[in-house]
Amino acid sequence: MSQQKPRQRGGRVPDKATPEQVMGLARNLPLTHSVPGKAPEDATPGQLGFLANLFEKENASRAESKRRRLPGQAGFPQSRPWRDTTGGMASFPADRGSEQPESLEFVDRDEDLVLYGDVGCGKTHLAIAIGMLACQRMIPVRFFTASSPVMRLRKAQDDNRLDAELKSIGRAGLVIIDELGHLPIDIDGARLLFQAGADSYETRSVISASNLESGRWGDVFGDGDMAAAAIDRIVHHGRILRFHGESYRNKHSLMK
């Protein structure tokens, strides 16, 4: 009785390959430039059409998978879709013209945005909604409360991997820092936060949400010079959205 020869790795695929064989091969093929480059020489028009359709669907599938992953990777504390955001409590600068934050044009230009106003006026809600829009448009986002990146950067510094942590933050196209000024930050933590902000200057957008006017940012950074430098960068390459009105939580409180 003759024995079946074992299938050799890298052997020629039969002309009448089964769908299972095709899928088995495709699973192990992160394609290089050299292989697809030879396809027009070896394939018939029908085969090229099939491959184009296959690759188009694969690209669409990967893009959709990435779109679903991005919100989880961003670290949003909760979901705040844009449709639930009115923006009615924020006043926009007069020079904005018809541009609104949801267009994300400021992200395309690597500009910064400061959301300033009293507690409970919707700053965090708007910041998350903008971040979720960015994720839908395939822009990587990182969301932090102000104390969180300080702790991460300090631990990274202690572990001699500060550069790696800064690069990790730097992979985002939009960084959101919430509650800036809610809790005091010591001078070393402020320097680390400033370094992360300096690395982002004109290379990615940063949204900062704070209830402190710029004149009190020295309280955040613990150093007037660092505060002045941070404000200078924002004035040069950013905008301020002012929030006003009664706190949403107070307005809808059950304790009345």
Question: What is each residue range found by the language model?
Answer:
Residues 1-34:
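Charged, compositionally biased N-terminal leader segments and the immediate start
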Residues 23-77:
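Interdomain "pre-motor" coupling segment immediately N-terminal to P-loop NTPase/helicase cores
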Residues 80-102:
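N-terminal pre-Walker A segment at the start of P-loop NTPase domains
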Residues 102-110:
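Phosphate-binding P-loop
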Residues 105, 129, 133:
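Active-site signature of alpha/beta-hydrolase-fold catalytic machinery across serine-
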Residues 110-126:
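Walker A/P-loop nucleotide-binding motif
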